[in-house]
Design a protein with these regions (language model features):
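Short glycine/serine/threonine/alanine-rich loop segments
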Residues: 35, 46, 224
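C-terminal regulatory/effector modules of DNA-binding transcriptional regulators
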Residues: 199-307
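Interdomain hinge/linker segments and adjacent boundary elements that couple functional modules
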Residues: 2-24, 32, 38-42, 49, ...
Length: 307
């Protein structure tokens, strides 16, 4: 039976997800172009400090400035127009709007980014540049994969939405690296231990790699934490597609990935996802048990590969 999750009350003034993701996009485009804040400011007709605030989603940006900057960075007009339509008005204040429905959403709390390859590039940039991540995965996620496993799961024959900068995605996203000092907690569904993605040999190597990462965890320094989530109970996160809570420049939002990325902040729905992820973290195996499960599963895969 699915365990119900009660969201906590709101504790912060949320920023609209589209503004947060736009900020990541603007910074990624600027840095890929090799431009300084001052150069971007000249293109936008604003100050360097204003551009910096836009990139950190600390202040609203006008539609005209969005258009000037994105066209300056070489973004196609159809994608520029799409982003301008997605943003809240420059004078939008969430507290002035009533929350609607069971999800308790204000008008711009949820954003489904349906812009195809540009949307996937933005999602990759969000995950790579976040200062903190808490995520639940039914497959080993980006950043933790061996080369052989990555090739298997990103094979176009089986992969609908690539969460790595693969050939065909916009050039700028290939320059985005994982943030230094990122605090990332990955909850892996227990089924990962038994699904031989890429074959037994490939999966055995991947599980060994995960076990080594768990062995190298530094509890004092933070950084990467990997835990196995047992199948002994059905939790709220099991109903979601690649749920994660990420923090970018102090802004917290939840993300999901199905046929396209989605983002949410501020709403009851967003708080419920966050609470569900924390419930899953509490139910996950400890470090030692996670390591034992990974080693045991790797041994099983390797034995089957040799038979």
């Amino acid at each position: 039976m699915l365990h119900a999750v009660s969201p906590p009350p709101p504790t912060e003034l949320p920023q609209a997800p589209a503004r947060i993701v736009l900020g990541v996009y603007l910074r990624g485009l600027r840095q890929a172009k090799g431009e300084t804040l001052e150069a971007a400011a000249r293109a936008a007709g604003q100050s360097a400090s204003a551009v910096s605030r836009w990139e950190r989603a600390e202040s609203p940006i006008s539609p005209a400035a969005v258009q000037r900057l994105l066209l300056h960075y070489g973004v196609a007009k159809q994608h520029v127009d799409y982003l301008v339509r997605s943003l809240p008005p420059q004078d939008y204040t969430r507290s002035e709007h009533e929350e609607q429905g069971y999800a308790k959403r204000a008008p711009f709390d949820h954003w489904a980014d349906v812009a195809g390859e540009e949307a996937m590039a933005r999602y990759i940039a969000v995950m790579r540049t976040a200062s903190e991540i808490l995520q639940f995965c039914v497959q080993v996620p980006a950043g933790l994969r061996t080369q052989a496993y990555q090739e298997a799961v990103l094979d176009p024959a089986v992969c609908v939405t690539a969460d790595e900068p693969v050939l065909g995605l916009p050039r700028w996203v290939h320059t985005i690296t994982w943030a230094q000092g990122q605090r990332r907690t990955v909850l892996l569904d227990e089924t990962v231990l038994t699904k031989p993605a890429g074959g037994y040999e490939v999966m055995g190597g991947q599980l060994r790699h995960l076990a080594e990462l768990v062995s190298g965890e530094d509890a004092d320094a933070g950084g990467l934490v990997i835990r196995i989530l047992p199948m002994s109970q059905i939790l709220f996160v099991h109903t979601l597609h690649w749920p994660a809570e990420v923090t970018l420049h102090g802004h917290r939002l939840v993300t999901g990935l199905g046929l396209f990325p989605s983002y949410e902040s501020g709403s009851r729905a967003a708080r419920t996802v966050s609470a569900g992820l924390r419930e899953a973290l509490s139910a996950a195996c400890g470090r030692e048990e996670t390591h034992q499960l990974l080693v045991r599963a790797a041994h099983t895969m390797e034995r089957r590969a040799a038979s």
